[in-house]
Structure formats: C-alpha cells, structure tokens
Amino acid sequence: MLEYDKSLKVFADPDFQFTLRNAQISAASSDKEEDYDVLSELLVHRAEHGNQRERKLGISKAIEIVDKVSEDALRGLACFHIVAQINTDAPKLENGLALLDSLYGKILMDKNLPTGTEWLEHLDLLSAIRLGINGINSFKKINEFMPEKLSQYFECGIKKDSDDIQKLKNEFSSNGLPVNCFIQHPLNADNFILDIPRMVNDACITLNQGNSLISIPLNEQQKDILQKAIDSFKTIDLKSEVMNKKFMEYWNNYKYLQKIQVWWDSLPCHFSITQVGVALANAYAHTLDNRIPCIY
C-alpha cells in the first residue's frame, strides 16, 4: 500500500476500515500465501475505485470470499475474463497473436485449467458468476469468437493482379510514396494489404542514409492519397473460409493459444461474470504479473 501514498487518506474512510477488517478476517481464515496476495491487490483496487459504488461493492464482496475460492477456479475465472475482455492493437497478425499467447501464458503458467461444471457451480454459489440455463445459450467457439474480436486482421485486401492495385501503386510512385507498403495478405495469399499505420498523421517516410534513419513527415497531398488507399482496404470479411482457415493455422502455432482454444471450446455452459468475479479475476491476474491491465 505504500506505493499508493496519494490514496492513504482512504484509511480515514469508515467503509474502507470495515473492508480492511474483512480482509484481515479472510487472511486469518486462510493458510495460503496466494490468498494474501489476492487480498492485497483487492485492497489496492478498493482504494483506487472507492468512488464507484458497484465496483466498490464487488471488490468488498470479493474480499469476503477469497479464502473460499479454489486456485483452480480463480485461474479459470481470470483466464475467461482476460480472453473475453483484452484485445490487441498490434498492426501485424503474428505480432498480435504472439502478444496474446504471452499474456495467456502468464495466467496458465503451464498449469491445467478447470474443466467440467464443478468449478462453475462453485463460483456461482459464491456469486462470482451467474450460470445460464443449460441448452438455452452457449459461448461462440474460438474459431468464430476470435475473428470477431480481432476483426482488424480480416480486411479483404485487394487482388494482387487487379487494375485497382496497379492504379494505387502508380499513384504512390508518382507522389513519392513507397510501394513496398503493399504486402501479401497473411490470411489470403492472392491479395495485398497495406502495411502502414491506419492513422495517416502517424505515418512518415523513413529513409536509410548511411548509418542513420531519417523520418520525413508526409505532406497534405500524400496524406490524402494514403487515406484514400486505407479506405479502399477497409472492408472486413469475417465469413471468408479462406481467411478463417488460415487464421486458425496461425493460432495453432502458439502453445497457449492452442490450450485456450481447447479449454474455451469445451466450456460446458454459458455464464456471466458478476462484479465480484471481475474483482477476483483482476486481482488474481495482477498477482501473477502486475503489467496485466485491470479491466472492470
């Protein structure tokens, strides 16, 4: 807590004092060091989010049940929350998948994820999740869920041998823009995509002069041409069998992405995470790596 000096005034809040007392009771009821770490994280989150009533209530309730939640259930809860909520904005597909693989690996740590219904019923009893009705609803499988979540990688692109590509290349060349930013689509070998930032104001031309790189900002005409090109590549196609098949080939090249797919696709029933569960998931994930973002 000393890292949060600016929040020390929270100790004067009677409600926080009550929460702290509950944390002490939970700690006394547990003999697992992992529980102490989760409780510490929850107290920090309570200090940081105390002005938001629903969040505060969820954190306070999570503190009361920490000693009652198994580590397997915590791991499954945190994993589900992260897969469902955290995205990647890496411009290249392989970089984005590598980032997700690294993130999931921090939660899994080569341990098994819970299967069956027992861990879900356990979390439901503790009000960390709400179980759906069997047979009424189910989660989308990874091969459908992830393309929707990572839709930026499913731009259709433009046929390599098309007149449209040739016109764009000619326009780039005649206006001092490099044509090597047209690259093969990672999910469709017949098409090109643009390997440039989608915000034209962030784009620049980089020249290699001797041992140094020089960045030259774009003029307004170049920005207009670039924006026009970006717009022509914008169409997303999540129903393309070619791209979906290739995407899953990439996905299965990564150890933890594979494990997540097997686990996610075997979830036995639909459920939703409550504010209590969100607090637990965030706190547990943060104890494993404090660089994992907390998403409430």
Where do the PLM segments sit?
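Accessory beta->alpha helical hairpin/"wing" motif in late/C-terminal subdomains of nucleic-acid enzymes
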Residues: 36-44, 94, 111, 116, ...
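Glycine-centered, phosphate/nucleic-acid-interacting loop/turn motifs that mediate DNA/RNA or nucleotide
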Residues: 127
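Short helix-coil junctions and helix-kink-helix linkers
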Residues: 82, 86, 96-114
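Eukaryotic partner-binding/assembly regions in large regulatory complexes
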Residues: 1-64, 234, 252-255, 268-271
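Short secondary-structure capping micro-motifs at structural edges
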Residues: 60-66, 106-109, 117-119
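Glycine-rich, aromatic-bearing surface loops/beta-hairpins
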Residues: 289-296
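Intrinsically disordered, low-complexity segments enriched in Gly and acidic/Ser/Thr residues
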Residues: 221-243
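Short alpha-helical segments that sit at the start of domains
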Residues: 52-92
